[in-house]
């Protein structure tokens, strides 16, 4: 796996009663269904992939690639999550980090709940991770 949400999804698919090959197939299928988003900040001024980035700006990463720059972490998280959702999505998990508040995470959840109106289950977890305000998993 390449991301934390993919690793978590693969771990949840593990079944000790299955063979190595069956587990490999199930775990691979599980992590292949996961799209990952990350909301972080620019540590310094830079240029990246055609984007002019200023220190402190909020960066939205779509499966590891810079998607857009924002100034508000809640807006960035909602916008990025919406871009990760596809027709078959069923679950959204938002892990909020050490530099995001539970209130901000619940604002994200509220906006996504309103947008998807129960069609997609939205969960918020205090991940406590450094560097990333939010890590987003869409399955």
Where are the predicted features?
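N-terminal loops that bind phosphate or other acidic moieties
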Residues: 1-139
């Amino acid at each position: 796996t390449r991301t934390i949400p993919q690793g978590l999804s693969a771990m949840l698919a593990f079944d000790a009663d299955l063979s190595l090959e069956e587990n490999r197939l199930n775990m691979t299928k599980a992590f292949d269904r996961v799209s990952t988003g990350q909301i972080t900040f620019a540590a310094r001024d830079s240029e990246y992939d055609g984007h002019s980035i200023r220190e402190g700006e909020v960066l939205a990463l779509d499966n590891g690639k810079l998607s857009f720059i924002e100034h508000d972490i809640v807006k960035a998280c909602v916008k990025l999550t919406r871009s990760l959702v596809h027709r078959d999505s069923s679950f959204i998990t938002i892990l909020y980090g050490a530099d995001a508040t539970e209130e901000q995470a619940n604002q994200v959840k509220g906006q996504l709940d309103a947008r998807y109106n129960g069609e997609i289950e939205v969960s918020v977890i205090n991940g406590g991770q450094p560097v990333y305000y939010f890590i987003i998993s869409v399955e």
